Design a protein with these regions (language model features):
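Amphipathic/hydrophobic helical signal segments and adjacent flexible N-terminal regions
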Residues: 1-75, 81
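Contiguous, well-ordered beta-strand patches that form the walls/edges
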Residues: 1, 57-63, 89-141
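Short, well-structured hydrophobic secondary-structure segments
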Residues: 72-95
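Structural motif
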Residues: 53, 83-85, 129
Length: 141
């Protein structure tokens, strides 16, 4: 029934799509299938359109240019957006959140460094900027 409704113009909202999480050990060398690919809900007011594939072109660390053979220089991520939801796949992890400023709807997944350490991050759109605030780090509000 849902497919027929969509064929006749009904919106597929971001809330209709289950939250995605990083699989054990990360998703591997290729991106997983699109998570929000069937979502037709427009982006919320004030959300910057960040959808697409993003690749590091240049980077600095501690004020120094990162060497071309540093693994950071091969980092690529894919961002999907729908409604107030944003999904960032990169480094083997999936960060899926509603950018509504609440801890409840933030990212609850694992760190890219070991695929086991829990991370909790509040996501929001503020003045046209995508803002991430890790939970439990003093001085980050």
């Amino acid at each position: 029934m849902r497919v027929l409704q969509l064929a006749y113009g009904d919106l597929m909202k971001c809330s209709d799509i289950p939250i995605a999480y990083t699989p054990a050990g990360g998703y591997g060398p290729t991106f997983p299938p699109l998570i929000l690919g069937n979502c037709t809900e427009p982006l919320v007011e004030g959300a910057p359109d960040l959808r697409g594939i993003w690749k590091v072109i240049t980077a600095t660390r501690a004020g120094e240019t990162v060497a071309p053979d540093d693994r950071l220089m091969s980092y690529t991520e894919r961002i999907e957006q729908c409604g107030n939801r944003i999904v960032d796949c990169g480094g083997g992890t999936i960060a899926d959140a509603r950018a509504d400023g609440t801890e409840e709807n933030g990212v609850h997944d694992v760190s890219v460094f070991d695929y086991t350490t829990p991370i909790h991050v509040v996501a929001s759109y503020e003045d046209g900027i995508f803002v991430l605030r890790p939970v439990g780090l003093p001085g980050i509000e």
